């Protein structure tokens, strides 16, 4: 998992423009231009994320209007004596929903009372309770999930529209001989007087009615709706209610996964119930007080592309408890047989996921300081999440020093950060460019044949690594943009996310007309 540490956060919706089809390539360089860097404030005010229906206004309306019957979306096994064990489809009376992550509920079947993870339940008979409803996910994530193994032609999901408030988008997996598996998207528009439609000749009172219709007949869609997109059970938001600073004895260290400069990484079990990753730090690595202060901020940063920080043991030796990612670090994964065989579209998509997580951190005004493949973790379906953000600045080891320390990641660090300690989002952008070379070269060490001192001297004078073998020129040009000596001339992560997500997008419109045959 690399030399530094882990946790999790949330991104900015990207706007759907026009109409869209599938993954095929138009030269990305023809559609993007140098990014006009925007000025940014320095304050950070991260907000905890919750299911789509859990906006503060909606939470109030749930209790205020008496709509307190919820249904379980997944099975859940209690982790503490205060939790409820429940099965998918079980119904609850919500007793207290004043906290975002865990709600007090009473099971209507067993009569028992306890806490349930708020992202595992939804209002009964609501659209959020439907298996095919994926809420506020992006078009790109919809494509990733539908193209996962196990989804047949006609697999579908419905998500919130990224451009029209109160409207939805229908995403369908399709196939043809020319393009193979690909995704088509349709706008579900809302009528002024109520009701929904894709094409005006077929209007429905509810989205549920619309789905039932198109599961019986394709009626102009690319394919009949066959089955909801397969979904992985989500991580709970935290281990349990009030499980933040935990007892060391509640963690069992089961298997060492790796050893870094400042400690070990373990596969562990919390409270005899939950698989977790545990980073154990060597005593003296950082001040427990400073770590706990930073961790309080880190736990608020939540996004699908950031490893979620679950809990901490704040006395030395410090334990950092996070979600477990089955394939470990991106660096190790790239060097392994499975990662080494990845093709360019996979690599670009992984880069886009990292850029998405970093774009969220950019919006939150939070700096990673140690962005590299060793600090990106890989899970099922090639999902990538950023780990170890923010903790590098807390390290007090003399060897973690850009001038003479052997542990400092010089080859990934922007010159203004290495020479003058000026760490900003723009220095993270520089590091991201180096990470792109790691992806393209399947884990090769940057600046091959050069030591740290040589790298620092050469980079200060404008040296760039040459284009890696097999790297498209358009992608290398983006790398070079991230390595501009003037930090303000480097692109934003928002721009990098857009560029990479659309790198293989076809020239077809983003949304298909409803009467397409």
UniProtKB/Swiss-Prot annotation:
Which positions does the record annotate as the modified residue Phosphoserine?
Answer: 50, 206
Domain Protein kinase, residue spans: 251-504
**CDD domains xrefs:** SH2_Src_Fgr
Q: How is it modified after translation?
A: Ubiquitinated. Becomes ubiquitinated in response to ITGB2 signaling; this does not lead to degradation. Phosphorylated. Autophosphorylated on tyrosine residues. Becomes phosphorylated in response to FCGR2 engagement, cell adhesion and signaling by ITGB2. Prior phosphorylation at Tyr-511 by SRC inhibits ulterior autophosphorylation at Tyr-400.
Q: Pfam families recorded for this chain?
A: PK_Tyr_Ser-Thr (PF07714), SH2 (PF00017), SH3_1 (PF00018)
Arranged from A to Z, the UniProt key words for this protein are: ATP-binding, Cell membrane, Cell projection, Cytoplasm, Cytoskeleton, Immunity, Innate immunity, Kinase, Lipoprotein, Membrane, Mitochondrion, Mitochondrion inner membrane, Myristate, Nucleotide-binding, Palmitate, Phosphoprotein, Proto-oncogene, SH3 domain, Transferase, Tyrosine-protein kinase, Ubl conjugation
Please give a single GO biological process term from the UniProt record: regulation of innate immune response
The entry summarizes how activity is regulated as: Activated by autophosphorylation. Prior phosphorylation at Tyr-511 by SRC inhibits ulterior autophosphorylation at Tyr-400. Activated by phorbol myristate acetate, phosphatidic acid and poly-Lys. Binding (via SH2 domain) of HCLS1 that is already phosphorylated by SYK strongly increases kinase activity.
The Gene Ontology terms for molecular function here are: ATP binding; Fc-gamma receptor I complex binding; immunoglobulin receptor binding; non-membrane spanning protein tyrosine kinase activity; phosphotyrosine residue binding; protein kinase binding; protein tyrosine kinase activity; signaling receptor binding
**Bias (Basic and acidic residues):** 17-33
Primary location: membrane
Q: Do you know which SUPFAM superfamilies this protein is assigned to?
A: Protein kinase-like (PK-like) (SSF56112), SH2 domain (SSF55550), SH3-domain (SSF50044)
**SMART domains xref list:** SH2, SH3, TyrKc
Gene Ontology CC terms: actin cytoskeleton; cytoskeleton; cytosol; mitochondrial inner membrane; mitochondrial intermembrane space; plasma membrane; ruffle membrane
User: Which topology term describes how it sits in the membrane?
Assistant: Lipid-anchor; Peripheral membrane protein
What binding partners and quaternary form does the record give? Interacts with ITGB1, ITGB2, MS4A2/FCER1B and FCGR2. Interacts (via SH2 domain) with SYK (tyrosine phosphorylated). Interacts (via SH2 domain) with FLT3 (tyrosine phosphorylated). Interacts with PTK2/FAK1. Interacts (via SH2 domain) with HCLS1 (tyrosine phosphorylated by SYK). Interacts with SIRPA and PTPNS1. Interacts (not phosphorylated on tyrosine residues) with CBL; FGR tyrosine phosphorylation promotes dissociation. Interacts with CLNK.
Q: What's the protein here called?
A: Tyrosine-protein kinase Fgr
């Amino acid at each position: 998992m690399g030399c530094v540490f882990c946790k999790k956060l949330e991104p900015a919706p990207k706007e759907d423009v026009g109409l869209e089809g599938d993954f095929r390539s138009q030269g990305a360089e023809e559609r993007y231009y140098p990014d006009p860097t925007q000025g940014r404030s320095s304050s950070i005010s991260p907000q905890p994320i919750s299911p789509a229906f859990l906006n503060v206004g909606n939470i109030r309306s749930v209790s205020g209007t008496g709509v307190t019957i919820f249904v379980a979306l997944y099975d859940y096994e209690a982790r503490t004596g205060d939790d409820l064990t429940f099965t998918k489809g079980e119904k609850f009376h919500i007793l207290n929903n004043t906290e975002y992550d865990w709600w007090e509920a009473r099971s209507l079947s067993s009569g028992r009372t306890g806490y349930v993870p708020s992202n595992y339940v939804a209002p009964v008979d609501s659209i959020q309770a439907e298996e095919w409803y994926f809420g506020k996910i992006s078009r790109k994530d919809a494509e990733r999930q539908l193209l996962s193994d196990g989804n047949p032609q006609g697999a579908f999901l419905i998500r919130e529209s990224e451009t029209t408030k109160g409207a939805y988008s229908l995403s369908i997996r399709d196939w043809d001989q020319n393009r193979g598996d690909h995704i088509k998207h349709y706008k579900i528009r809302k009528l002024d007087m109520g009701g929904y439609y894709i094409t005006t000749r077929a209007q429905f009172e509810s989205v549920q009615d619309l789905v039932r219709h198109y599961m019986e007949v394709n009626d102009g869609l690319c394919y009949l709706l066959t089955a909801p997109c397969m979904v992985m059970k989500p991580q709970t938001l935290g281990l349990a209610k009030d499980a933040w600073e935990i007892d060391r004895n509640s963690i069992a260290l089961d298997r060492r996964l790796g050893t870094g400069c400042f400690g070990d990484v373990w596969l562990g079990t919390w409270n005899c119930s939950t698989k977790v990753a545990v980073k154990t730090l060597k005593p003296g690595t950082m001040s427990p007080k400073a770590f706990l202060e930073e961790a309080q901020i880190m736990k608020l940063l939540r996004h699908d592309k950031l490893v979620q920080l679950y809990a901490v043991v704040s006395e030395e030796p410090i334990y950092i408890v996070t979600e477990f990612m089955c394939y470990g670090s991106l660096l190790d994964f790239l060097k392994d047989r499975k990662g080494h065989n990845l093709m360019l579209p996979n690599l670009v998509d992984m880069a886009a996921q990292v850029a998405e997580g970093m774009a969220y951190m950019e919006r939150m005004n939070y700096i990673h300081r140690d962005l590299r493949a060793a600090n990106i973790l890989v899970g099922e379906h090639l999902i990538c999440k950023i780990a170890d953000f923010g903790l590098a600045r807390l390290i007090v080891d003399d060897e973690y020093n850009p001038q003479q320390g052997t542990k400092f990641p010089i080859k990934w660090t922007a010159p203004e950060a290495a020479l003058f300690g000026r760490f900003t989002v723009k220095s993270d952008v520089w590091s991201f460019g180096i990470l792109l070379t790691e992806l393209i070269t399947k884990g090769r060490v940057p600046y091959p044949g050069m030591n740290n001192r040589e790298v620092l001297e050469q980079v200060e004078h404008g040296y760039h690594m040459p284009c890696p073998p097999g790297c498209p020129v358009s992608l290398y040009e983006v790398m070079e943009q991230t390595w501009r000596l003037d930090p303000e001339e480097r692109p934003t992560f928002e721009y990098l996310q857009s560029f990479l997500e659309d790198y293989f997008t076809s020239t077809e419109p983003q949304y298909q007309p409803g009467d397409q045959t």
